[in-house]
A protein has these predicted regions:
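Ribokinase/PfkB-type carbohydrate-kinase core domain
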Residues: 1-71, 83-88, 92, 103-107, ...
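Membrane-targeting and insertion segments and their boundary/processing signals
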Residues: 66-74, 315, 319
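Glycine/charged-rich beta-loop-alpha catalytic/anionic-binding loops adjacent to active sites
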Residues: 73-84, 301-313
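Short glycine/serine/threonine-rich phosphate/pyrophosphate-binding segments
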Residues: 91-95, 325
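Alpha-helix C-terminal capping segments
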Residues: 97-106, 331-335
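Short, conserved phosphate/pyrophosphate- and ester-handling motifs at nucleotide-, phospho-/glycolipid
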Residues: 100, 252, 321
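Conserved post-catalytic alpha-helical subdomain immediately downstream of the catalytic base
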Residues: 309-375
Length: 375
């Protein structure tokens, strides 16, 4: 185990409250999440149908791609059978509200939940402070052992901007929800192309809020969907928002590479170099890149890289990035330093992919306690 990871885990171990002090040792107040909303259908692809009751699963995304390549080479059409293994609410607001609600926070959800609110959101989040701006997206999440394929109908988040947010919810009303909150989480730029206009609007609004959140957590999402011109045009909005509050941007390994190429030019770079290039371009307080093998955080204190405990047979990988962000947000509220915060993000995501379930605060603490033993 590398010394950098050992130091990060030691810092997390020292800064995170002990299990017997949880949850009371963390100030679990209001948290606000916007501005998406999805209905996720978790699916698997059939490789071979044995009989009406049994089949073999197509296990890898590579194998899925090979079948497509062979079909293209043969100039032939192709069909797949897929099966739905479950369904749930999804997106940034749902996943983070679910996690923070389980940790005894008071989530405020402002996003796309339907009009009237769809039964799935009402059943799960009806006791939360939930406000719908429009229709949710629908995602078919196909799970493979080596990755996942997400097929998405975006919903009304695609057309959301600062003016539309005012019309659908109200800027003054949003300011009231943010007053006294400990965190604002936003996602995803990839599904809300005009999200930078909301960042600029928040910057102007911030001074009118008596007690605004100390941190805004930004998840850009799968920015491969956005062209380079849009990425470059929107980047300064994050730096402008960071002038009035701490902005923490969190992307996965692939997304970090796309952002680095857009801002620093196409090049072969390491994960760390990509993260540093994005930090220099966006000018947030922290930039965090999370990956399967390592997670990286760039801050005014420098760059830290933390190894991630691998899992050979994950129960569920869809939304692992959102769970990383939930852990990161928890660490930000608890005041952890950058490397330690990344350890907590890895812990929440690591628990989730191993169990397909939400960790309690005690579970998070236990994962940190055993972090080095999981390698």
């Amino acid at each position: 185990m590398d010394e950098e990871t050992r130091r990060a885990v030691a810092a997390a171990d020292e800064a995170l409250p002990d299990s017997d002090a949880l949850p009371g040792a963390i100030d679990a107040g209001r948290v606000v999440f916007g501005f998406d909303g999805y209905l996720d259908r978790v699916r698997e692809v059939v490789a071979d149908r044995i009989d009406p009751e049994s089949h073999e699963r197509l296990a890898t995304l590579e194998g899925f791609g090979d079948r497509i390549d062979r079909s293209v080479a043969a100039d032939s059409s192709l069909s797949f059978e897929w099966l739905q293994q479950g369904s749930r609410t999804g997106g940034h607001t749902s996943h983070l509200a679910r996690a923070f609600g389980g940790w005894s926070f008071d989530p405020v959800m402002v996003g796309m939940y339907g009009d009237p609110v769809h039964d799935a959101f009402e059943a799960e989040f009806g006791e939360y402070d939930l406000h719908s701006l429009g229709d949710p997206g629908v995602t078919d999440a196909v799970e493979f052992d080596d990755g996942k394929l997400m097929l998405t109908e975006i919903g009304d988040t695609m057309s959301l901007d600062w003016a539309e947010l005012d019309a659908a919810f109200g800027h003054d009303r949003l300011a009231g929800k943010l007053d006294g909150a400990s965190l604002l989480g936003t996602g995803y730029w990839s599904e809300t192309p005009d999200l930078p206009t909301i960042f600029d609007g928040l910057r102007d609004l911030w001074g009118d809020i008596d007690d605004p959140p100390e941190t805004v957590l930004v998840d850009p999402g799968d920015v491969r969907k956005l062209d380079g011109d849009r990425l470059r045009a929107g980047r300064k909005a994050i730096g402008r928002l960071d002038e009035v509050t701490d902005v923490v941007v969190s992307s996965n390994r692939a997304e970090t590479g796309v952002l680095a190429n857009a801002y620093a030019g196409e090049a072969e770079r390491s994960f760390t170099d990509d993260a540093e290039a994005v930090y220099d371009a966006l000018e947030p307080t922290w930039f965090v890149g999370h990956g399967v093998e390592r997670s990286v955080v760039v801050s005014p204190d420098g760059t830290d890289s933390v190894a991630v405990p691998a899992v050979s047979n994950p129960e569920l990988t869809t939304s692992s990035g959102d769970h990383f962000n939930a852990g990161l947000g928890l660490a930000l509220i608890a005041g952890l330093p950058p490397a330690a915060a990344v350890v907590v993000g890895n812990a929440v995501a690591g628990y989730f992919v191993r169990t397909a379930d939400q960790p309690s605060l005690t579970d998070v603490r236990a994962f940190v306690d055993d972090y080095l033993e999981k390698f």
